[in-house]
A protein has these predicted regions:
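Alpha-helical protein-protein interaction scaffolds
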Residues: 1-89
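Hydrophobic alpha-helical membrane segments
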Residues: 7-14, 18, 25, 46, ...
Length: 187
């Protein structure tokens, strides 16, 4: 089988990176970019590469690519400073596992994400269901406690846990999108 020349291989890897990025899989896109840069350090669209690396929270690689982009476009010193200042304030990634652990206490995982109203609602809703179940169990109405509290609590409690994780993903996506938008607006 004939081997592909390095230049064509780099182009193919960049196309795969773009396809993965458009499909929402930035980690795979970054892997293809790493492979392309290993073959040819000057290959590809540096702006797109920077945005992909930023989405993976690999800000050092993103800054390296954007500096290379600025060099090739002949940017002035002010743009370099603006980009460097932006990269000094990179967004912090919130951890899904932290939100899940914190949501053991209903609502706290929501508070971690800044969703105060949702957290208070989750805490109140779970509290009402637990109180109802405890009152039914105290009155020795166990079937009523299980049906009236146990089953709904399964949905409200587990739903709160999964919602806390969803909020982390939404928040991370929003913060990195805002960061990339600021970067593009500087160029």
């Amino acid at each position: 089988m004939r081997s592909i020349p390095a230049e064509e291989r780099c182009a193919l890897l960049h196309e795969k990176a773009l396809a993965n990025h458009l499909a929402g899989n930035s980690e795979s896109a970054a892997t293809y970019l790493d492979e392309a840069f290993a073959l040819d350090s000057l290959s590809g669209n540096m702006l797109l590469s920077s945005l992909i690396y930023n989405e993976c929270y690999r800000f050092d690689d993103g800054l390296r690519c954007i500096r290379r982009h600025l060099r090739t476009t002949g940017a002035d010193a002010r743009r370099y400073r603006d980009v460097a200042n932006l990269y000094e304030k990179t967004p912090r990634r919130h951890n899904e596992n932290t939100a899940l652990v914190l949501s053991i206490i209903p609502g706290v995982g929501h508070f971690y994400n800044g969703a105060w109203e949702e957290g208070a609602l989750s805490l109140a809703l779970n509290g009402i269901v637990i109180t109802f179940g405890a009152a039914q169990a105290a009155g020795k109405m166990f079937v009523s406690a299980i049906l009236g509290a146990g089953i709904p609590l399964t949905y409200t409690y587990m739903g709160g846990n999964s919602r806390a994780v969803e909020l982390v993903e939404e928040r991370n996506t929003a913060k990195i999108s805002e960061f990339n938008f600021k970067l593009i607006s500087l160029l």
